[in-house]
Amino acid sequence: MGSVLGLCSMASWIPCLCGSAPCLLCRCCPSGNNSTVTRLIYALFLLVGVCVACVMLIPGMEEQLNKIPGFCENEKGVVPCNILVGYKAVYRLCFGLAMFYLLLSLLMIKVKSSSDPRAAVHNGFWFFKFAAAIAIIIGAFFIPEGTFTTVWFYVGMAGAFCFILIQLVLLIDFAHSWNESWVEKMEEGNSRCWYAALLSATALNYLLSLVAIVLFFVYYTHPASCSENKAFISVNMLLCIGASVMSILPKIQESQPRSGLLQSSVITVYTMYLTWSAMTNEPETNCNPSLLSIIGYNTTSTVPKEGQSVQWWHAQGIIGLILFLLCVFYSSIRTSNNSQVNKLTLTSDESTLIEDGGARSDGSLEDGDDVHRAVDNERDGVTYSYSFFHFMLFLASLYIMMTLTNWYRYEPSREMKSQWTAVWVKISSSWIGIVLYVWTLVAPLVLTNRDFD
């Protein structure tokens, strides 16, 4: 009897796996908007992929991965192939994830509403989509080595660079939303309390940035060397000061009354993180001490010796993973009314989301079964670009690939280590990020004929 009930329970999931409504999450949660639930499912699938990629790097997994035909053959370099199998496995797994999201991105170009037949693919058929993704990932493990890893290293670097910029855009959006929320509460009542909270958060961010700058100069520079690090730290410090001053200029405040130092402080902290991340990728070990050596432990060489495993888990990589998770899930649930950020992320403004969300009373809830269904709030128009969302997850897959492998590049004839290319990618992304933030401040003054409300 129990087995019959179990089969009946499993059968109730079939509409979720093959139907047009994403009820995978809704079975456990109250009914939600189709637009939000769908994005959360895609984000959770990417999170599962990240967890599997982390497992690939666990010591001992190379014995299982070596069983794949041709996966570790004809490799004669400084680093033994059995040490590199985790590195290669992450590349192939992330290649499969990236191709899955890229195909969906191309398929969803110019989808305008949920009435488009392609929207049913985006919002449903989960079993078939995930089965296709798994098939692509498995197939990626049988791609001949050749130049695959080298080519995909450069593709991953370009994609990770773009995703870092998207992280910055989402961070700008978060900072604006945070500031607006607290300013509104400050204006509604108990102004002293909220003003103190706003001031404390801003001061804390700037204090963290100042401490970071001091530590950078102490540990990542030397009087007679490390000139690149000195330049990176100094330039980014000056750029952050300039952006902070610009955010409170009278002209800027006149065009954007709610711009302020809180947003600038958040951008400053993120810029300091990118600066640190760039310096930790420098090939010269004297200008790139490990975190363990800084806190008092012995430093290990970037290039492993015979029989040693590669040190994958660096502090900046762990922080990078945390930022990645926050940004992906924030992009899945965000409903922003910041028009400049919405234009950059191809997302509708908050008013559209509210109007669509009100469609529940019009019978948009699925009738005729007891399964919780998502509310179709996109019948009149999508609330975000399906194509751009999948493209962002495509870039996120590449970012994860580079983060988990510490941006290392392996050349069989030589060794595996950090490259100056990775340093310049990260440091240039920090500069472009500050430029993007400054543009959100000055755009209303430059483009006076456009509405930025």
From Swiss-Prot:
The keyword Membrane applies. GO terms for cellular component: endoplasmic reticulum membrane. The modification Phosphothreonine is found at T352. Residues 2-39, 110-123, 173-197, 253-259, 331-387, 448-453 are cytoplasmic. It is found in: Endoplasmic reticulum membrane. One of its GO terms (biological process) is phospholipid biosynthetic process. Its main location: endoplasmic reticulum. The keyword Lipid metabolism applies. The modification Phosphoserine is found at S351, S361, S364. It holds the Pfam family Serinc. The chain crosses the membrane at residues 40-60, 89-109, 124-144, 152-172, 198-218, 232-252, 260-280, 310-330, 388-408, 427-447. Keywords: Endoplasmic reticulum, Lipid biosynthesis, Lipid metabolism, Lipoprotein, Membrane, Myristate, Phospholipid biosynthesis, Phospholipid metabolism, Phosphoprotein, Transmembrane, Transmembrane helix. Residues 61-88, 145-151, 219-231, 281-309, 409-426 are lumenal. It is a multi-pass membrane protein. A lipid is attached at G2 (N-myristoyl glycine). Belongs to the TDE1 family. Enhances the incorporation of serine into phosphatidylserine and sphingolipids. Interacts with SPTLC1. This is Serine incorporator 1. It comes from Pongo abelii (Sumatran orangutan).
